[in-house]
Regions:
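C-terminal, well-structured catalytic/ligand-binding subdomain of enzymes
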Residues: 1-126
Length: 126
């Protein structure tokens, strides 16, 4: 697996950030060497670093065995902030998707996964 981070000036590709982990994660912020300098803390990035840390911690602590119930709980906020914006600020999650590559299944939540259940999406054929 690889992480790809890019902007209008360059593209960086790196295998997993640590060879001992079996996941990649990304949010609206750069983490790869050579890209971090492009982060702009003057714009609203929708809590990108907090969301990244939630993802990284949850996947690190799980250490494999990633499955649909884990992904559903992760996106619903059971492991920390990810999609649970304060709606009074005008922000919310519009949709979330879980891709199960081993079983060739896609699950979609039409809205914030804390309030909307994931349903299998059969429109895409592997």
């Amino acid at each position: 697996m690889s992480v790809i981070e890019c902007n209008a000036e360059q593209i960086k590709i790196e295998k997993t950030l640590n060879s001992n982990i079996a996941f990649v994660c990304a949010t609206n912020t750069f983490h790869l060497p050579g890209m971090v300098g492009y982060n702009n803390d003057k714009i609203d990035n929708w809590f990108a670093e907090e969301r990244y840390q939630t993802l990284y911690s949850a996947f690190s602590e799980k250490n494999g065995g990633f499955n649909f119930p884990f992904a559903e709980k992760l996106l619903s906020g059971d492991y920390g902030f990810l999609c649970q914006y304060d709606r009074s600020t005008g922000k919310d999650t519009v949709w979330s998707v879980i891709y199960d590559m081993k079983r060739h299944k896609i699950y979609r939540s039409e809205g914030n996964p804390r309030r909307h259940k994931f349903k299998e999406d059969i429109r895409f054929q592997f």
